[in-house]
């Protein structure tokens, strides 16, 4: 009986820990290196990141931005990097452009000053532990300063040192930011795939079964 109670306690603890998720990407540490937004603030742009660890179902996402005024809106998207090979000056860079939309948020109002946008309750599978998160601003007045914060380096995971920007023609392009590293401030929390959790629980069950037989 004691062994059964112990087994349930271990399973409950592990299941609870897995449900809470792990920080698989974190670029939220000081210093702040500035902000970035394309000259045309209506263009979609974002950062390509790689997640750390085995958890690949995104459950939480945080993004830092600045806005001088409480006006305009934004939309967050997660895109798989499964598009065409990026070209610069007619030569292939070897990087695949963002394409397939994995997630799109509802439109949210921009708030004045420095802000952290927090999105929770997600369940977004990420292919190959890598994706590009983007933002698209709308209805931003010409007099308004708005942009995403730049930080470096990420303390968990890694980020491609460039920003993807989608011009009006729809062809994505990589842009570098002079005198700084183009890593947008963000944090990602994820949980393992259900199959991984199931295998872990099966392994625990087998271990307790073996221990009972030994007794």
Model region roles, listed by residue range:
Residues 2-22, 184-201:
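Short, threonine-centered small-residue motifs that mark membrane-proximal processing/anchoring sites
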Residues 18-38:
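Boundary/junction segments of secreted and surface-exposed precursor proteins
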Residues 31-43, 108-112:
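Extracellular beta-rich ligand/substrate-recognition surface
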Residues 39-52, 117:
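Short beta-strands within extracellular/lumenal beta-sheet-rich domains
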Residues 56-68:
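A short beta-strand element within beta-rich, extracytoplasmic domains
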Residues 208-215:
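C-terminal membrane-anchoring or membrane-association module
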């Amino acid at each position: 009986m004691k062994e059964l109670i112990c087994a349930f306690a271990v399973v409950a603890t592990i299941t609870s820990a897995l449900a809470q998720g792990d920080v698989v990407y974190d670029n939220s540490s000081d210093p702040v290196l500035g902000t970035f937004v394309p000259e045309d603030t209506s263009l979609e742009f974002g950062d390509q990141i790689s997640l750390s660890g085995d958890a690949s179902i995104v459950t939480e996402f945080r993004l830092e931005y600045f806005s001088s005024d409480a006006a305009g809106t934004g939309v967050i998207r997660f895109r798989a990097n499964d598009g065409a090979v990026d070209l610069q000056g007619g030569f292939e860079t070897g990087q695949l452009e963002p394409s397939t939309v994995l997630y799109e948020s509802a439109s949210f109002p921009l708030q004045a000053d420095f802000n952290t946008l927090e999105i929770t309750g997600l369940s977004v599978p990420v292919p190959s532990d890598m994706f590009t998160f983007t933002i698209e601003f709308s209805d931003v007045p010409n007099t308004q300063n708005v942009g995403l914060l730049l930080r470096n380096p990420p303390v968990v995971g890694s980020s491609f040192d460039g920003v993807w920007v989608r011009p009006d023609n729809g062809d994505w392009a990589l842009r570098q930011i002079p005198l700084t590293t183009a890593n947008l401030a963000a944090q990602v929390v994820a949980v393992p795939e259900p199959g991984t959790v199931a295998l872990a629980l099966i392994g625990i069950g087998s271990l307790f079964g073996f221990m009972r037989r030994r007794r």
